[in-house]
Swiss-Prot record:
GO terms under biological process: protein folding; protein-containing complex assembly; urea metabolic process
Regions of compositional bias (Basic and acidic residues) in chain numbering: 182-200
SMART domains named among the record's database cross-references: UreE_N
Pfam family, one: UreE_N
This protein's name: Urease accessory protein UreE
Region listing for Disordered, in residue ranges: 170-213
Role played: Involved in urease metallocenter assembly. Binds nickel. Probably functions as a nickel donor during metallocenter assembly.
Annotated organism of origin: Burkholderia mallei (strain NCTC 10229)
Length: 213
């Protein structure tokens, strides 16, 4: 059994004829989120998918097997919900409530697409949206920080949040440290001046009272 263990970076340009000749690996979104997977190419060949943890495959990705052969990824048709609305406000509200539930969503022109879920379909209908069940490829938005994780699971959402926090710290950590140091210096100077006046200041009120004792 061949092992597929590499994904060619999207910015690497390959000859179209070379990619077209490569066998396809057709997977639904749930399977494309798995870095370890036993799968079957469209040719009928069984393969083992062993990719870096956290990899999310997208339609059109090109993979490399352990023998150097190319394999192209295709998004399978699956049960989805197509969400439309009579106005932008209703569609925005629908997107907000889906995001609040960490639901993977594919954003189209005037339409949202998500995996079929009857409970979500009912919620969206109550919000005033029009919901249609269909069979189509599903390719949701990637994570804002490149993680691309499946947000429906708390563990992967926590990973995306941790990554977002790391990016924030990298951009703002230095200025925060500088401010902290400044505050520390200020406190030090303040304490020093206070001690100096207490020991030597003839007009210090504490010294004046002490003299009367």
């Amino acid at each position: 059994m061949r092992t597929i263990d590499k994904r060619i970076a999207p910015n690497v340009r390959l000859a179209a004829t070379l990619v077209a000749r490569a066998p396809a690996l057709t997977l639904a979104y749930d399977a494309r989120c798995k870095s370890r997977l036993a799968a079957t190419l469209d040719t009928g060949e069984d393969v083992a998918l062993v990719l870096p943890r956290g990899t999310v495959l997208r339609d059109g990705d090109v993979l490399v097997a352990d023998d150097g052969a190319l394999v192209r990824v295709a998004a399978a048709h699956e049960a989805v919900l197509l969400v439309r609305a009579p106005d932008a406000l209703t569609l925005t509200r629908a997107a907000y409530h889906l995001g609040n539930r960490h639901t993977p969503v594919e954003v189209g022109a005037g339409c949202l697409k998500l995996e079929y879920d009857p409970a979500l379909a009912d919620m969206l209908t109550r919000l005033g949206a029009t919901v249609e069940r269909a069979s189509a490829p599903f390719q949701p938005e990637a994570g804002a920080y490149g993680g691309g994780h499946r947000h429906g699971h708390d563990a992967t959402f926590a990973e995306d949040y941790a990554l977002a926090q790391q990016v924030f710290d990298e951009h703002h950590g230095h200025s925060h440290s500088h401010s902290h140091s400044h505050s520390h210096d200020h406190d030090h100077d303040h304490d020093h001046d206070h001690d100096h006046d207490h020991q030597h200041g003839p007009s210090c009120s504490h010294g004046h009272h002490h003299g009367h004792r």
